[in-house]
Amino acid sequence: MHKSVVPFLNQRNQLQNGLVVVSGASRGIGRELVHVLLASGIEVVALSRQACKPAENLTALSADLSDADGLSTAVDMLKTVIDGRPVAGLVNAAGDVKPLGALIHQSTSDLLRALCLMAVAPVRLAAAVAPFMPTGGRILNLSTRSAQAIFPGLGAYCMSKHALHAVTESLRHDLNPKITVAELIPGEVDTGMQADLRNPDPDEFPLASFFRGNRANLIPAAIAAQFCNWVLTQTTPEEFNRPEPWFIYDRADQPRWLTEGSAFDYTEP
């Protein structure tokens, strides 16, 4: 049985004062991260296709970040909500593994939607919040090993995440030193995206067999969110700004965000 993992809550908060904007906030890691941030007393602006449930210190915005019109709407709403207030952080957590299958079989519209959601939207959201970020503001892009490799049948996802890696590097070049930008790989997490990877016919998507067999190793979204929260709020400015992605399976970091006596016993695939 996997042990419950909770981060140290007594570590010094390194995040500047201000709002935190989270995309992909209605499900998976994004939703859990919103809960953690709110519990820490941080005001959150949550962006998602389906608006999050109302909560104290939460502003929920509904927009489709996978097309140009929806993205423009999201940016306009975001600027209105910010209303000149400081933004301490932006977490780009929105993503989708679909469409699945060979890249050459995907439609132009599906490919453009994937790129817009996972590469263009992070750029436009960063551009929207950067003018309101104080020195020390942070942008955290949720990435994947698919940003560094190619997996059969995941061509559109890999393409988009490779683009997100380039976005991270470009934003770092454009915004440093005032605003720091980091990339985080949360591992194999038990979210709806995993269900999307298990459900297809293995004859059409061979990796479905792997994902069906890997369910026991999936990390609960709440634990992945705790790791994201630690990186965003409790690492030092120098640490956060490191060039390599943060990786949840990195044992060197685990003692810093796991409670004493807890174990991270999820096997890296």
Residue ranges and their predicted role:
Residues 56-69:
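Rossmann-fold cofactor-recognition segment
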Residues 79-84, 117-137, 173:
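Amphipathic alpha-helical dimer-interface segment in Rossmann-like NAD(P)H-dependent oxidoreductases
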Residues 183-184, 202-261:
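C-terminal helical subdomain
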